[in-house]
Amino acid sequence: MDKVTFSVFRGHPDESGSPIGEMKEYTVDLDEGMVVLDVIHRIQAEEAPDLACRWNCKAGKCGSCSAEVNGKPRLMCMTRMDDIKEEMGDYEGPVDIRPMQSFPLVRDLVTDTSWAYEVDRKIKPINGPDDPDWVFNQHEADRIQEFRSCIECMLCVNTCHVMREHQKFDEFAGPRFFVRLASLEM
């Protein structure tokens, strides 16, 4: 069993909405098969019961536990600690866990992704061709399923430089909605 140090962002927005806070270190005994979300739950249970973290399914189906782990956008429920160990070279230094940087901070690891749902409501359905003899083939139905596999984790928006570095939320819908429009277009 490894004893690993985690550096976790703790903070909240100030009056202007800018995040203020600090990285706080926690040392956790890892069990075999743990994922990052298990670590967060252990920190909540043993050291920081007020650590805010959003999660729901713990199966990579809902996207609620999106965060940045060692600078990479990931689902905490699907990020195995064994993989982190391999990437870091046997846990050299603390494992860094931060909220998604493209979205407004609510508290600690929780961000406000409501913007995405507001944009989604603005997208109108697209109807099929006007031709009454138009046939929807199986290969078209199969292709749509590819686009519908998106779990709305918003990690693609978090990594998009237009959204992350330039904060163009009013001018650009972002990558998530290109996928949404593509699924409607089919």
Language model regions located:
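Local cysteine-cluster metal-coordination motifs and their immediate loop/turn environment
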Residues: 51-83, 145-165
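Intrinsically disordered, low-complexity coil segments
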Residues: 14-21, 82-94, 166-173
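Eukaryote-biased recognition of intrinsically disordered, low-complexity regulatory segments
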Residues: 1-27
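Ferredoxin-type iron-sulfur electron-transfer modules in oxidoreductases and energy-metabolism complexes
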Residues: 34-46, 95-186
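Residues at beta-strand starts and edge strands
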Residues: 2-4, 63, 93
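A positional/architectural concept
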Residues: 21, 27-30, 37-41
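Well-ordered beta-strand positions in beta-sheet-rich domains
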Residues: 23-27, 76, 94, 161
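A generic, well-ordered mixed alpha/beta core segment in the N-terminal half of proteins
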Residues: 66-116
